[in-house]
Amino acid sequence: MTTSHMNGHVTEESDNEVKNVDLASPEEHQKHREMAVDCPGDLGTRMMPVRRSAQLERIRQQQEDMRRRREEEGKKQELDLNSSMRLKKLAQIPPKTGIDNPIFDTEEGIVLESPHYAVKILEVEDLFSSLKHIQHTLVDSQSQEDISLLLQLVQNKDFQNAFKIHNAVTVHMNKASPPFPLISNAQDLAQEVQTVLKPVHHKEGQELTALLSAPHVQALLLAHDKVAEQEMQLEPFTDERVYESIGQYGGETVKIVRIEKARDIPLGATVRNEMDSVIISRIVKGGAAEKSGLLHEGDEVLEINGIEIRGKDVNEVFDLLSDMHGTLTFVLIPSQQIKPPPAKETVIHVKAHFDYDPSDDPYVPCRELGLSFQKGDILHIISQEDPNWWQAYREGDEDNQPLAGLVPGKSFQQQREAMKQTIEEDKEPEKSGKLWCAKKNKKKRKKVLYNANKNDDYDNEEILTYEEMSLYHQPANRKRPIILIGPQNCGQNELRQRLMNKEKDRFASAVPHTTRSRRDHEVAGRDYHFVSRQAFEADIAAGKFIEHGEFEKNLYGTSIDSVRQVINSGKICLLSLRTQSLKTLRNSDLKPYIIFIAPPSQERLRALLAKEGKNPKPEELREIIEKTREMEQNNGHYFDTAIVNSDLDKAYQELLRLINKLDTEPQWVPSSWLR
């Protein structure tokens, strides 16, 4: 069968199915496995009225027949009424005269009547009431039986639903057609009228001249002509041409998708080749194809504007569409895949723990739609329908990025990174028997790691991909602890001490624990928490310490409870920790804000240390830079932000700004913290 979807209407013909869709399109780049079928156009996408000459002619003919019928009925009624004695007496009364206003005179031959007539819509209740009334007027048993059957039918739920559909279609079919401009040169016509009225001196002519020359009216006529010109330039779409073309496809079910192609609005669809067919491969979120809901993955493209597509590769399709603009008509074979209606997907926010560049990825299905991002970026995942390739927006780019981009799915990224590590380990040289054994065990573990679905011991944290995030605004009375991380001689201790000295009422340090004896000038609970070695070791076993160590046979450490005491006091806890402590801290309920203090360039670092009276050797500077890279690579996923300390005063101001921002703006934190 043939079904045509035009401007929301559905009409049915025979043999083949046809659907018309209004969509739009963006720019195209290079072919990979899929290609985005987008190309530039002159106008923005908009819904255009479909005007079919044959239909319009039939409507005009029906209107003319109805007008003649009404005239004949009117004449008949007039003859009947004229024979009335009462009307003859009324005719003797002289008629009232009024003022003849030529403005409202119509030209000869023009009949002002609406092409659509009001259709009364009956409700089920009206039908039921009418049947009950008829039932009371009928007396024979056969009629009563027939009415009873009809009443049962009217009360049937399926009938009532069908009746509602009938009413809805009736209302829709009787809506007036969109207006079509009579002329596109209203400005010229107004100028001509003003020229004709120049020699005229009577009041009405002067008033009309002033009206037509008013700036607002001139602007209105200009706007009218611009819109009318676009409307009248559209070539009326002829269904006959399309029906002739689809006849060659025999009994195959086809559909027509109508698109108004634009230069700057993306279509959001990709195509691929299957043998000699061109198949819609992917519908991208945010595009006109996805919003219309009428273009589907798996549809085969047969024709575009009467040009046969079968046998062309995706590059030829791109070249073809590049030269087309305006209204495009696609003839498609619908996909045979039966898919459940897509559920409304919840947007998931994730933090990326790796860098991604689609131009360097041989696996991305459509390189033009690949979304690049850097470690630490927030991504808004809006579709996981394809588990290997998610559709996402990058934080801050939603307004500038009309189409969602493709990013690797979590499992897919983990598996290929595991395989990549396995291949790299296979290439490592074997140096000694002992190293060979260690390498062999590691390699074996990684190979098991690759099969993530079958490995119960699989550690997701070992291969970092994404971390689900949520927005969190810290309460005024419960501040997040500030953690400063960085290699030695990068200034984190100096920055921490400056904050403590300048704003003592706002910042505080956690009181550490120790097993050494208290000295005379020390106060328990202020300088240290003095505990026995046995108690200290028990707390270590219980995981109560963020970090701990041994110095001169005495244990020292910072506990989670010590940090919590500062938070409960309403102050901001300042800590300078080693990277080994970050995992324990992040797994606690303290919600830390971790700032990485990074060194500047090697030359700038030498100058800064020289100001402090230090004269480091070149190898020491290289070691600091290398340590920085190592910390970023191994622990960068824990960092909330970073400060490059090229000047201590500027670094201090930036640190203070970031801390103050926690009070005014919500921050992205792991979703697990808020559960």
Swiss-Prot record:
Region called Required for the correct localization of PALS1 and PATJ at cell-cell contacts and the normal formation of tight junctions and adherens junctions, residue ranges: 1-345
Region (Interaction with LIN7C): 181-243
InterPro entries, alphabetized: GK/Ca_channel_bsu, Guanylate_kin-like_dom, Guanylate_kinase_CS, L27_C, L27_dom, L27_dom_sf, L27_N, MAGUK
Name listed for the protein in its UniProt record: Protein PALS1
Domain PDZ span(s) in chain numbering: 256-336
UniProt organism field: Canis lupus familiaris
Similarity comment: family membership: Belongs to the MAGUK family.
Membrane topology summary: Peripheral membrane protein
Residues bearing the modification Phosphoserine: S14, S25, S83, S84
Job of this protein: Plays a role in tight junction biogenesis and in the establishment of cell polarity in epithelial cells. Also involved in adherens junction biogenesis by ensuring correct localization of the exocyst complex protein EXOC4/SEC8 which allows trafficking of adherens junction structural component CDH1 to the cell surface. Plays a role through its interaction with CDH5 in vascular lumen formation and endothelial membrane polarity. Required during embryonic and postnatal retinal development.
Keyword tRNA processing: no
Domains: entry comment: The L27 domain 1 functions in targeting to the tight junctions by binding to and stabilizing PATJ.
Domain L27 span(s) in chain numbering: 120-177, 179-235
Basic and acidic residues composition-biased segments: 10-36, 54-78
GO CC annotations on file: adherens junction; apical plasma membrane; axon; bicellular tight junction; Golgi apparatus; perikaryon; plasma membrane
Record's subunit section: Heterodimer with MPP1. Forms a heterotrimeric complex composed of PALS1, LIN7B and PATJ; the N-terminal L27 domain of PALS1 interacts with the L27 domain of PATJ and the C-terminal L27 domain of PALS1 interacts with the L27 domain of LIN7B. Component of a complex composed of PALS1, CRB1 and MPP4. Component of a complex whose core is composed of ARHGAP17, AMOT, PALS1, PATJ and PARD3/PAR3. Component of a complex composed of PALS1, CRB1 and EPB41L5. Within the complex, interacts (via HOOK domain) with EPB41L5 (via FERM domain), and interacts with CRB1 (via intracellular domain).
Span list, region Disordered: 1-78
Domain SH3: 345-417
